[in-house]
């Protein structure tokens, strides 16, 4: 197992302004046993592919760059760098980038999502 992992910020910078990128940092393929971690770049105007959704696991975002708008159970929040957002399992939510620059965040999912089930479900 690789104990130290790095976000490839160079790949994020080289990607197109309108391109969404997900970099797996910890997943089934890399030996995850308790959670998954992805670094995600969301372009301006982009966001939750499923719209308002929920998950069977807790989802935690840590914002690295930009400002992400979050809606949780009907209440909206603007979250900038250093913000930690917690979506408990089963709670309706969505996220999107309402700003003009891309956002970059870490997404933690715990416990380990079932690979045989869809991760997001529209609600």
Where are these regions (language model features)?
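A short, N-terminal "cap"/entry segment at the start of jelly-roll beta-barrel domains
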Residues: 1-35, 43-44, 50, 118-123
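Short, conserved beta-strand element in jelly-roll/cupin
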Residues: 39-42, 54-70
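Short, solvent-exposed loop/turn positions at domain surfaces
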Residues: 36, 48-51, 57, 73
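Structural motif
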Residues: 60, 67-69, 76, 92, ...
């Amino acid at each position: 197992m690789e104990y130290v992992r790095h976000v490839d910020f160079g790949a994020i910078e080289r990607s197109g302004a309108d391109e969404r990128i997900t970099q797996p940092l910890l997943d089934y393929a890399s030996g995850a046993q308790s959670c998954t971690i992805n670094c995600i770049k969301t372009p301006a105007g982009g966001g939750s592919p499923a719209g308002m959704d929920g998950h069977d696991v807790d989802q935690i975002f840590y914002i690295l760059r930009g400002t992400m708008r979050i809606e949780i159970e009907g209440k909206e929040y603007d979250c900038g760098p250093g913000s930690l957002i917690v979506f408990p399992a089963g709670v309706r939510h969505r996220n999107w980038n309402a700003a003009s620059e891309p956002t970059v965040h870490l997404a933690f999912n715990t416990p380990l999502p079932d690979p045989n089930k869809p991760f997001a479900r529209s609600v």
